């Protein structure tokens, strides 16, 4: 994430989050979601949608239809969201975390396909990094992904370990 938003753009994004929260996230709703242990999928989709709040656009590189935000911007957005509701902040951060391996290590075709869909469609991602023996300690993971090649081109990965 080499890019960063300029200060004005970041401030507008943070203000937009505050305005959305004031309008759409009353304390009573946040308490209800917490008490019912409910994932508010439709609300998260609205927050991700370019037509509403477009939080995910901040994380997507310019060339795929996003705003090209950097690590500092991710931190500030998540910090602001967490001040409103940790569950919603985690939900929004999940797409960033889930798409980061594609952004960093995916092929150009994969980046174009999936990063563009986050920007255009508000597609949500998830990130899984646990194993029975490791929990969420990434350093203790034992799963290995071995490339599977056909005609000299990697077409998939064979994954070992227990998930």
Tell where the protein language model's regions lie, with residue ranges.
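Alpha-helix boundary/interfacial micro-motifs
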Residues: 71, 78-79, 87, 102, ...
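Glycine-rich, Trp-frequent "lid" loop and neighboring beta-strands that shape
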Residues: 66-67, 109-163
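Amphipathic, small/basic residue-rich leader segments at the start of a protein or domain
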Residues: 1-92, 112-113, 117-120, 153
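Short, well-ordered alpha-helical packing segments
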Residues: 78, 82, 99-103, 115, ...
């Amino acid at each position: 994430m080499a890019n960063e938003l300029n200060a004005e753009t970041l401030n507008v994004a943070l203000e937009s989050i505050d305005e959305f929260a004031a309008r759409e996230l009353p304390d009573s709703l946040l308490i209800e979601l917490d008490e019912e242990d409910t994932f508010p999928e439709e609300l998260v989709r609205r927050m991700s949608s370019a037509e509403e709040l477009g939080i995910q656009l901040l994380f997507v590189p310019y060339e795929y239809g996003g705003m090209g935000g950097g690590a500092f911007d991710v931190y500030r957005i998540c910090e602001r969201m967490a001040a409103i509701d940790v569950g919603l902040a985690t939900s929004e951060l999940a797409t960033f975390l889930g798409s980061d391996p594609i952004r960093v290590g995916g092929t150009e075709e994969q980046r174009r396909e999936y990063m563009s869909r986050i920007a255009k469609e508000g597609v949500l991602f998830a990130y899984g990094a646990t194993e029975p023996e490791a929990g969420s300690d990434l350093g203790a993971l034992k799963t290995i992904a071995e490339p599977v090649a056909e005609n000299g081109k990697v077409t998939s990965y064979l994954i070992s370990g227990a998930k």
